[in-house]
Amino acid sequence: MAASPADASRRRREKRRQLDARRSKCRIRLGGHMEQWCLLKEQLGFSLHSQLAKFLLDRYTSSGCVLCAGPEPVAPKGLQYLVLLSHAHSRECSLVPGLRGPGGQDGGLVWECSAGHTFSWGPSSGPKSPEEPNLTPLPSTDERSWCPEAKSGQEPAGLESNCDERAQEARMPRGAGPPPETFPSLGEDGEEEEEDEEEMLSDASPWTYSSSPDDEPDVPKPPPSPVTHALKDGEIAPAPAAVPAPLASPSSSASSLGSGAPGPVEVRIQPELRGTPQADQQTEPLASPGSQAQSALASAWDEDTAQIGPKRIRKAAKRELLPCDFPGCGRIFSNRQYLNHHKKYQHIHQKSFSCPEPACGKSFNFKKHLKEHVKLHSDTRDYICEFCARSFRTSSNLVIHRRIHTGEKPLQCEICGFTCRQKASLNWHRRKHAETVAALRFPCEFCGKRFEKPDSVAAHRSKSHPALLLAPQELSGPVESCSSILASASLGASEGSRSTLAPQAPILLP
């Protein structure tokens, strides 16, 4: 049994009410805050309002910052303590420690060098008291010596990086040498800071050595220069251009040794080179630091600049007229790239993107047009009006709808000046002009204006061109009375079909 029209209309109204209720839940009324909302969406880089709303919900519900997800930064004290431990290890061992892995106390990291010296460090760790050392002390010896690997001539992994750094410094531009090492000032404030640093190092350093009774009292000796360990057989020592001149003077070195501060670089290099057979060969380049250093930098700079070719001058693209060679297409392009793009998407792969809906069957030239079309088959409405919170499937529909609130009518008819908001309204209006022009078959011979009926033409003549109607009649025929002319004019205006005035007999008045 078929349902009655009343039941069908009732079900239709119920479905419409449910649809409106479901859509109203998705609307967000921003009121007067629409400008701030759009500005925030552009700053965060979201293309849809729903993405911004999802981001704000996630940020509100999350415990931490959404944008700053990741591990917490390490405290400066922890990093300073790590540098302190590494420096203390370098004073006693020339090998560079590497990360062995987690396993220290409180989940810290364990560092170990090739000689077996280990120490642990954690991000939250700091300097501890000497009673609780956190490092594995070195075995006590009667004489301070280097590790077996360094003695046997095996170069550790850390020294290879030093050689690479020196090679990179040799390739630097002329006059832009490596930055000199910064040494503490030798004034009273500098001496106090150095003494405090030595005390911290002695407290934090677990590597203690016991000297023999015949040796002199334990005086803090300066750490050996890495230059002496990086030298190999036949290798020339680098010029001490980075060592400041005041630090190379004997008076400054004597004052620094008396105050307990580490001595300058030259004081550390000379004693070790004195007993070797290569000392005489290596002290000669050290005596003249300016000539060889500048020549090495100059040669390296010339080699680098020679590899760089002349500046490339880019030529402008030629302007030419390239017509499309497909039959029936008269498009002309000024660039071959545009022509190839036109051929590919307008002729070769013409409408290769088809709609997946079986009942639709539409096809498009570009994939982006297909994506916009697929939205019409779904109920996805990502574009929301900022004035009334209505949602739309495409951005073009939102732009047209927004003109209702702004009052903008950018489209105008070129015939009568009619303005409208969307192209469909303008096309419908232009059809009226086309139909009207086809229906006006009777023109006026004086001004060219067209009318639908001949009666309208006669009325137009008598109203708009009365003088032009009288002039031909005076030149063509005999004398006529004024009353006959007026009578014929009124008769033509009333009947409409008679456009010419024939001569009539005079009317006799009683």
UniProtKB/Swiss-Prot annotation:
Originating species: Bos taurus
Any one of the GO CC terms: nucleus
Biased composition (Acidic residues): 188-201
Function: May act as an transcriptional repressor for PCK1 gene expression, in turn may participate in the hepatic gluconeogenesis regulation through the activated AMPK signaling pathway.
Zinc finger region(s), C2H2-type: 322-347, 353-377, 383-405, 411-433, 442-465
Pfam families assigned to the protein according to its UniProt record, in alphabetical order: zf-C2H2
Cross-referenced InterPro entries: ZnF_C2H2-type_TF, Znf_C2H2_sf, Znf_C2H2_type
Family that this chain belongs to: Belongs to the krueppel C2H2-type zinc-finger protein family.
Biased composition (Polar residues): 278-297
Positions of post-translational Phosphoserine modification: 161, 225, 464
Entry protein name: Zinc finger protein 692
Maturation and modification: Phosphorylation at Ser-464 results in loss of DNA-binding activity.
